[in-house]
Structure formats: C-alpha cells, structure tokens
C-alpha cells in the first residue's frame, strides 16, 4: 500500500513597494497578498499603510515590503496588528527595506506583531539613510493572545535590524526568542513580560530630545531611554499589551512632535 501523500499547504507570497518624493507618490508596486494603502491626509506628512490581505503569516509564507523617501517627510505603518500563527513547516519570513534620502525624514511606526503559540518567524529590517536624514523606528511584539489565556510554550523567532547612515554601519540588533525566554525567573530573557517594544530615533539632534522623552515615560510599564552619537533608544516591557501600546503611543508622539498615523486611532 502506498503511503499517503503529505498535503501541500498554500503559502502566502506578497511584495509591496512605495516611493515618495516630497508629498508626491513617485512609484508603486504591489503583488500577492501585500498591498499599499495611501490614506488621504491634510496638513500633515503623507502616510503609507502596508497591508497583508492574508490576515497573518505562518510557516513558509514570505512577505517583502519596501518604502523609499527621496526627500520631505513620510510616515510608514501597518493597517492593524500583524499576526504570526503556528507553523507546521518552515519558518515564515518578513523582509522590510527602507531608504531615506538626503535631508528626508521617515517615521516607521508599524503596529504590533502578535505571536501565537507554535510560531516560527524570521524578520529582517534593513535601513539605508543619508547622513543628514532622520529616522524614527518602532518595533513591538506581543507574546500570545491574552484574551484567550494563551501562554507561549513553543516558539522560534529571529528578528534582525540593521541601519546604515551615510554609508556607515550605525546600528545592528539581532534578537532570538525561544521557549526558555519566558520563564518568570529569567531576567536575561523577558522576565515574565508578554509585550515588548523598542523605539529608535536617528537624528542629528537625538540627544537633545532625550529629556523630553523621559518625561513622558509611564510608571506602569518598565521602560528606559538613553541617547548618544545622534541616536536615541527607548525600551519597553509590560505584563499586558494595552499599557504598552499606550506608553509607546505617547513616546512616538513626543519623539516625532506629531500625531500618530490615522490607522492607529481606529
């Protein structure tokens, strides 16, 4: 008797790219499940909203996003929280490429990524910015679905961020998370936290904005901020997702001196 064939699951593929020159959309590409939305905004920087129409990512999926800002100011985000589901095969992969031209500003503030139990995910974020450009970059992770009482016991996450500034390497971060990182007795891991965020500002006046940011850091979320060499970084850890989201929102508004993207307020 022949062995039953292993079913082949449909995999998500998507590519989306947008390029702005000032307030004008210069180039746009989208294919597969990756889409680009350009909301109509008035009196503020143009916003680019990336969307995964598959509703989430799982093993074997591949999404590629790119946003290029030649000059002026642009805000990039995601339409909603992204979900990374249990994988029954290879790792899912999300790649994001950002470029910021001379004197340009990019606020890259996607909404949170929610990790389900059994997730296997690899994310790679690469930024190339001019020496006098400005970057605000936010990354937020929520570990499990609190409303369902989910506790992550099996997960594999590899998260990499790399920034070059004026052609020189300015920042590299590589994060790996596994089941052992969620033990409440592990201060080297997340020490019991289920939501974490990292906010980075790369700007010539980054050090000058540190005190104003520290002034809005909350007391109900573990957080700290520091600045050096044209870079400001704030870290957040929280036992629940909502206090973290609220804290991050205030920090982003303070650092960018502006309102959050409109989709954050839905």
UniProtKB/Swiss-Prot annotation:
InterPro entries: UreD
Keywords: Chaperone, Cytoplasm, Nickel insertion
Predominant localisation class: cytoplasm
Record keyword Chaperone present: yes
Keyword field contains Chaperone: yes
Gene Ontology MF, one: nickel cation binding
Source superkingdom: Bacteria
GO cellular component: cytoplasm
Cystine bridges: none
Cell compartments where the protein resides: Cytoplasm
Family assignment from sequence similarity: Belongs to the UreD family.
Function: Required for maturation of urease via the functional incorporation of the urease nickel metallocenter.
Subunit: UreD, UreF and UreG form a complex that acts as a GTP-hydrolysis-dependent molecular chaperone, activating the urease apoprotein by helping to assemble the nickel containing metallocenter of UreC. The UreE protein probably delivers the nickel.
Protein name as annotated: Urease accessory protein UreD
Organism: Jannaschia sp. (strain CCS1)
């Amino acid at each position: 008797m022949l062995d039953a064939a292993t079913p082949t699951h449909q995999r998500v593929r998507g590519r989306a790219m947008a390029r702005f020159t000032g307030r004008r959309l210069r180039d746009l590409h989208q294919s597969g499940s990756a889409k680009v939305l350009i909301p109509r905004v008035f009196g503020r920087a143009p916003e680019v909203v990336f969307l995964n129409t598959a509703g989430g990512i799982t093993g074997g999926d591949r999404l590629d996003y790119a946003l290029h800002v030649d000059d002026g100011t642009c805000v990039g985000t995601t339409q909603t929280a992204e979900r990374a589901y249990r994988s029954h095969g290879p790792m899912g992969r999300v790649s994001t490429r950002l470029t910021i031209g001379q004197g340009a500003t990019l606020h890259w503030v996607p909404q949170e990524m929610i990790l389900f139990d059994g997730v296997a995910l690899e994310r790679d974020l690469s930024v190339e910015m001019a020496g006098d450009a400005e970057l605000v970059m936010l990354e937020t992770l929520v570990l499990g679905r609190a409303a369902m009482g989910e506790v992550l016991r099996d997960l594999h996450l590899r998260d990499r961020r790399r920034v070059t500034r004026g052609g020189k390497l300015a920042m590299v971060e590589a994060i790996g998370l596994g089941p052992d990182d969620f033990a409440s007795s592990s201060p080297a891991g997340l020490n019991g936290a289920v939501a974490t965020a990292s906010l980075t500002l790369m700007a010539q006046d980054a050090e000058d904005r540190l005190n104003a940011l520290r002034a809005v850091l909350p007391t109900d979320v573990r957080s700290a901020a520091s600045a050096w060499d044209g870079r400001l970084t704030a870290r957040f850890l929280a036992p629940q997702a909502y206090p973290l989201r609220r804290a991050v929102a205030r920090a982003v508004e303070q650092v960018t001196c502006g309102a959050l993207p409109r989709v954050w307020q839905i």
